[in-house]
Amino acid sequence: MVQRLALALCLGTAFLAPAAAFGTIDGLGQHTEHEEITRAALVRAGLGRETLDALAGKKGTFGAVGAPDRPDRGLLTEAAAHCDGGDHLDIAGYPQDASAAARALEACKAWKLKALGDAVAAAGRIVPEGARAIDAGQIPEYVGCVFDGSSGRAKCDVLEALGLAFHVGQDFYAHTNWSDAAAADQGGPENPPGLGHEGPAPWMDPVAGPGADFPAGLISGCFEGVPESLHCTYGADLLRVRHAALNKDAGRIDRATGAAGPGETPRGAAHGNFARAVAAAIADTQAAFAYFEAETLRVYGAERGALILCAVKSDDPDDCR
């Protein structure tokens, strides 16, 4: 999970960044958590090495899944892209009611669903309607994908959209209380209640669609700027639930197995919360990719859809002919 201000300063970007998220570089208190989660999730998905590198990132690159944390991508302050801003406590005078908090998290879910829909839509350009062959011009064979938000070759657009969906899905578990252990010491804004769920949230499963019932008690953290200690207060310096109090943003992950080490934030270090969030994020990423595969086959039919999926996964489109 990335400390975005530090990252922005490291890259020479002179603006304030939003809350942290699963890490995208190896340094500045992060350990390429987004990359490791994505690789652990898709290790058996049949992606070619270069394709997985482009999607998950590798040393020196953000990849599609890390692009929302890239300072020049323009999404650092987009709360919906990181599941931020859904804070609420059931106490008198809290400045954000439960319905407003739920709307912030509904926007996060909608971001994921739109990205998956965009991936399926872009995939259709890989094998044009009526054709029985891959359009080689839609495959990045010599020049890699950029992931800067501009539309280009179809496979790049597919990977970029999948990266957006995976990123926000992973941040959901890092930034909310869904997977946090419910413990007796919890209760206030500095240690809000965990929901104690194991595994991914059915509410975030794209199969559930936009109409699923909002999970009771689900919140994420307030983020208004850095340092966080100067923000997210109300009344006579009363605290809102801050991102700093709730995030499980940092720790080491084995990319081959998905096993997580100790959390390196206060919330992540308590009760095994980092490992719980990582396990849920891996499962969520797997479910999102399976949804993309199923939708591609449903929309384009078995024959065309299978050829499209082969081109998305393979490094060399000749392997699909």
Put a short name on every predicted segment:
Residues 6-14:
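Bacterial N-terminal signal peptides
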